[in-house]
Amino acid sequence: MVGVVVYGFSTEGYQIASTLASQGFPVSMVDEEMQIATEITPAIAKAIRALPDLIGRDQLLSIKPVEAALNEAEYIFFAPRVRRHPEEAGSEVNSKLREVAKNMMKGATVIYHLPSGLGGFETIVTLLEKVSGLSSKEGFEYVYAPLKPRTIEPYCLGFLSKPKKNLFNLFSKLGFKPAGLGCRSAEALHALKILGTYSTLAPQIEGYKFLESSERVKLGRLLGGRDVFIDTLSSQMLDLRLVAASLPPKEPLVHLASNILKIVEGFTKRVLEEVRALMKSLELKASKTKVILNWSVDRYEMRGDRLGIHQSLREKLRDYVSDISTTSSAPWSESNLEFKLKEILAEPSVKLIISGSQSDHEALWDRLSKEGLLGEYIFIKANLVFETMSTKTARFGGGYV
């Protein structure tokens, strides 16, 4: 049975590790921060569904040095967490790639799950060759397989050379279905998908600025703006930045990508402006208003953009309204919804609740509705149209403010 290493203590990495382990593959998962490799057995994969549940169980797990795990791996799935500032993300990833290259055995296949931008595979392969001393033609294989956020579904599969049958068999166990392309074509496909997604959303972000609240909601029903929240908008910022940075200078597409990036990056500021405008229109004083940021973020997912934007929004809100807390409904979150609700309701001030996703909004709304909790709430959906609803006492019919 072939040896597998998943390099990266990430949500996506654990999904890959547990999926393969449950099918009998010997799998080790590298925690790049703790510098240990943990064996993921079928029993662990069955018992532990989410990565946070694996933490703190060191006594029950088989651990080995990272070097030993990489030396034995025929397949290395590269799925680390990227947490540094966007300008430093490249050096962060490269340092982790060097560790892989330094210890991988001859004949290994490296499957790269982060986005790389256009031409990124050439830089990555060159680094792997230089550090490992192996040739990409004979010494190792490289596959580009950027994953969609929080999933193990790749946007595409890009190969340096004709893939072996064993590799396709392994990919089939993970449910990888995209047709195989060359690395350059795969990077172009991924870049076009990212640009296509954000080029549709960016005009809406700007266009809704010129409309009143009720008009925005009506138009949002037609264009789908009500369905896109800050959670989705921030989920692939790393991809967008890498694509924009890798485009040839002076090309028209560079200006398009740069402007889209500027618009999307400004959405956090837009949320803050909408909160200020709403409080002003309702004559709410900052000193008597409690703000709840109800947004589930996964601190273990590979891309760190959602986490960073959540933190930035929370800090900017705190600069304006000092009484602010956070809550979450996600299973991976360390925030307990029931406890947070009791904490929120203990305050007599008006509660302004900003939801970062539809699932967060529905979870909190349903809980408040079922409990019949008394109080006055103003809900803001942090979607493209900034849908706003209010409810008083136990009535949850809601209506636009």
Name what the model sees in each region.
Residues 88-98, 124-127, 306-317:
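Well-ordered, non-membrane alpha-helical segments in soluble/globular domains
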Residues 53-112, 332-375, 379:
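Rossmann-like NAD(P)-binding element
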Residues 14, 79-80, 96-98, 102-186:
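Rossmann-fold dinucleotide-binding core
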Residues 1-53, 59-68, 289-325, 392-400:
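NAD(P)+-binding Rossmann beta1-loop-alpha1 motif at the extreme N-terminus of oxidoreductases
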Residues 8-11, 31-33, 79-81, 113-116, ...:
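Structural motif
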Residues 228-229, 257-401:
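NAD(P)-dependent dehydrogenase/reductase Rossmann-like domain
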